[in-house]
């Protein structure tokens, strides 16, 4: 889990726009965040397996 201070810091509007970065809305992870969902890859995988993300299914070919 991310530290609460870092989550609050990321939520604040930065002085310069290039300093802004995405964090997972569910766990606060700063890396591998998909903008479309606002979630990190770990949370997307967990939620997709439980069927909580409509339209997302496991790839099979």
From Swiss-Prot:
- One of the GO biological process terms: translation
According to the record, cofactor stoichiometry and binding are noted as: Binds 1 zinc ion per subunit.
Entry keywords, A to Z: Metal-binding, Ribonucleoprotein, Ribosomal protein, RNA-binding, rRNA-binding, Zinc
Give the family from UniProt.
Belongs to the universal ribosomal protein uS14 family. Zinc-binding uS14 subfamily.
| PANTHER family on file | 30S RIBOSOMAL PROTEIN S14, SMALL RIBOSOMAL SUBUNIT PROTEIN US14M
The record's GO CC annotations read:
cytoplasm; small ribosomal subunit
The entry's protein name is Small ribosomal subunit protein uS14B
Origin species: Salinispora tropica (strain ATCC BAA-916 / DSM 44818 / JCM 13857 / NBRC 105044 / CNB-440)
* GO MF terms, alphabetically ordered: rRNA binding; structural constituent of ribosome; zinc ion binding
**PROSITE patterns cross-referenced by the UniProt entry:** RIBOSOMAL_S14 (PS00527)
Its job: Binds 16S rRNA, required for the assembly of 30S particles and may also be responsible for determining the conformation of the 16S rRNA at the A site.
What this protein needs as a cofactor is: Zn(2+)
Q: What does the entry list as the binding residues for Zn(2+)?
A: 24, 27, 40, 43
Gene (UniProt): rpsZ
Subunit field text: Part of the 30S ribosomal subunit. Contacts proteins S3 and S10.
Do you know which InterPro entries this protein is assigned to? Ribosomal_uS14, Ribosomal_uS14_bact, Ribosomal_uS14_CS, Ribosomal_uS14_sf
A Pfam match is Ribosomal_S14
